[in-house]
Amino acid sequence: MGEIIKLDNICQYNEMVGQETLHPLVSVIDLSKSSRMMKHVRMSYGFYAVFLKEVKCGDLRYGRNYYDYQEGTLVFLAPGQVIGIDDNGEYFQPKGRALLFHPDLIRGTSLGHNMKDYSFFSYEVNEALHLSEQERGVIIDCLNNISEELNRGIDKHSKMLIVSNIELLLNYSIRFYDRQFITRENVNKDILSKVENVVNGYFQTDKPQTIGLPSVRYCADQLHLSANYLGDLIKKETGKSAQEHIQLRLIDIAKEKILGTNKTVSEIAYELGFKYPQHFTRVFKKNVGHTPNEYRGIN
């Protein structure tokens, strides 16, 4: 595994590709006009990045997997994620365009508040967005608008207009992803991630105390699927039943409560939606091999 280069701010990236910094918190770059040849390297950014790949660029390591990015592909990276391939000694001229924006740019804005809604910045949506020619034109228009605003110079309107255009680009990306999910079949992994999000959200409410343990039907309803379809999908992808899959996430949450708090087993059982502590203890031991108290004692 090669070295990972960390770039904490926009200026560092601009310097790396020979781009003038027009704004310390945002940049739009035409990589084909980069004045510097690049080496293959794995990088982690301290800012958000959207890359529009204009030509086939081969396999890139994105998170834990490799993806073959084709022409007209959008790649989204959140701060802290890693992208690139290990250095093979070769230099190349980068192609495509990049939009970079620091979290500080959107802090306190509606976009900053809603960034969690753009799930394609996380591993939850682990496919890049493959654009049609018309969609590519829309994205380029958004990038051009941001670039034009940056070249005007910073004034009191700059932040609002730049952030609005970034938000517009991301909202178009949501629309284009919806189209891709309809036309592409490889969405099962995404649904599994959403099931986990539903379960996580369930335990952040009082539903466990008022309703009880999360059911397969509840998760399916939240994802607008039938319980049978969701059960078949999870069984195909994991080899486990939907109930077993949900229960594994429940056990992870239980472990966090056992090790992260001083609450009694009875209190934790009630918080998780079990009617009886004995039932919780049986389920926990079946999955972990130890009772909750034993697990707390050995950790």
Predicted segments with their positions:
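Generic protein-terminus/edge-of-domain signal
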Residues: 1-68
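Terminal helix-turn-helix DNA-binding modules in bacterial transcription factors
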Residues: 236-275, 297-299
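Short acidic-glycine-tyrosine-enriched beta hairpin
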Residues: 64-78
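An amphipathic alpha-helical interaction segment
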Residues: 137-197
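A hydrophobic/aromatic-rich effector-binding and dimerization subdomain
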Residues: 88-154
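A short, Lys/Arg-enriched amphipathic alpha-helix from helix-turn-helix/homeodomain DNA-binding modules
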Residues: 163, 185-225, 244-263
